[in-house]
Swiss-Prot record:
Gene that encodes the chain: akirin1
Claim: Aminoacyl-tRNA synthetase is one of the keywords in the record: no
Motif (SYVS motif): 183-186
Region feature (Disordered): 1-64
Main location, first listed in the record: nucleus
GO cellular component, one term: nucleus
Record family assignment: Belongs to the akirin family.
Organism: Xenopus tropicalis (Western clawed frog)
Keyword Nucleus in record: yes
Location of this chain's protein in the cell: Nucleus
Official protein name in the record: Akirin-1
Motif Nuclear localization signal: where in chain: 22-27
UniProt-listed InterPro entries: Akirin
Swiss-Prot/TrEMBL keywords: Nucleus
């Protein structure tokens, strides 16, 4: 059987990994310098200033939503959100009956501008959290549509490329073998 011996590392190895070690000195900040290391010495990219931010590329191209479409999408999303909250509320309640709160929200959904409505004029239609949820959902839907369009375009391009490959291969075979009949041997 093989026999092996191991030795315990000396304290010098631990000294190499300490902050005072020359191996770590290059990226460690000096006592009088700022806490972030210099990008030239440590190979990290400097963060961009707020004024120097590059604009994000437009994903939709010419497919921008009009304000009417945005409003319609927000209204649809809000009704989905309210239905979801109703279903969650109904699910959490016992099966025996429905509370007055859900009935009141149902009546406010059907007729929000009725005189008996509990919604005040000064009260905003959406809370900040609801607007955030709506925007996230709209962005997700828009991203999904863009992904679908992108996949369709890629599939079309791939099909065109395949067609040209098949045509090229067929032309090469015809040049090489001419009008001779194809055989299993060749």
């Amino acid at each position: 059987m093989a026999c092996g011996a191991t030795l315990k590392r000396s304290m010098e190895f631990e000294a190499l990994m300490s902050p005072q070690s020359p191996k770590r000195r290059r990226c460690a900040p000096l006592p009088g310098s700022p806490a972030t290391p210099s990008p030239q010495r440590c190979g990290i990219r400097p963060e961009m200033q707020q004024g120097q931010q590059q604009p994000l590329p437009q994903l939709g191209g010419d497919r921008r939503l009009t304000p009417e479409q945005i409003l319609q999408n927000i209204k649809q999303e809000y009704t989905r959100y309210q239905r979801r909250r109703q279903l969650e509320g109904a699910f959490n309640q016992s099966e025996a009956g429905v509370s007055n709160e859900v009935q009141a929200s149902c009546s406010s959904l059907t007729a929000p501008s009725s005189p008996g409505s509990l919604v005040k004029k000064d009260q905003p239609t959406f809370s900040l959290r609801q607007v955030g949820i709506l925007c996230e959902r709209l962005l997700k839907d828009h991203e999904d549509k863009i992904r679908e369009e992108y996949e369709q375009i890629l599939n079309i391009k791939l099909a065109e490329q395949y067609e040209s490959f098949v045509k090229f291969t067929h032309d090469q075979i015809m040049r090489r073998y001419g009008a001779r009949p194809a055989s299993y041997v060749s």
